[in-house]
Amino acid sequence: MNSMNTLSVIAIALALAGPGALAQETAALDKWQSVAKTDNQEAFVNGSSIVAVGEQLEARVKQNFALPQPSAKKGKTYLSSRTTYRFDCAQRRMAMKEVRTYVGIDLQGEPVQKATSSDKNLQWLDAPDSTVFGELLDYVCSQSPGG
């Protein structure tokens, strides 16, 4: 009977520890990695968001801005954005799939605006070396899943 109680206690302890351990693992995967910093902004990549889409990659990027950025909505500004970008590593270019902007830094506060683009309407931008876009592309392409 004593060994049965011990097994019950172990089973309960494992059941209670399981969700906490899983939450810690998930939190670690959702951390933002700082990839590029200038006087005006800092850009981060969520490493767990990097996925292959055909021969390209897609990743979520957070950008914090030093000064309020003008929004497409009249009279509104934002200090941070979360953008899903498509990366073409071979041609050193990237395109915005979705963007959401926020009043505060670190994606905090009221959402200001959002926009999306379909795969057939992507607007590709060059990502030259030593630029924020270039640093983002280099990081994402170096983290290629399965590669």
Which sequence ranges carry the predicted segments?
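N-terminal signal peptide c-region/cleavage motif recognized by signal peptidases
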Residues: 18-20
